[in-house]
């Protein structure tokens, strides 16, 4: 759903284990090709706070920094069929430049961090833009069927998209 490390840190392992193909919004590509942007959070935090000793310890744990290249990308929208499932992807910038939401089948809507029930959408990180979220993304999301089942990147699953949008703030 977007390029932040808490959403992509298992991507390489999943691709290798499942021969999985990836699809993401164009703006993720530059970010995910830079190893400084894909460092596991624990490694980054300890490296800064504890220096070389922490980096050596974490290397022994085999925590890896990987870069990623997509199999497919899209700019604004994408529509494709995967077996019997129809998938639609929508660029939803605001939380990050590369944020995207995905409608899978007739009912499922994966929002990543574009909608996080009970929390304000974080737009203060690099690439975030509260104005774009409020002026472009939220109005677009309100055009989608409100009865879609919402699966956010964090928090409670199972509410409807309409319920998630009624609570959205930034």
Regions of interest found by a model, annotated:
Residues 1-79, 169:
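Active-site HxH/HxHxD metal-binding segment of metal-dependent hydrolases
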Residues 9, 32-33, 84, 118-120:
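Activation segment
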Residues 79, 86-170:
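Metallo-beta-lactamase
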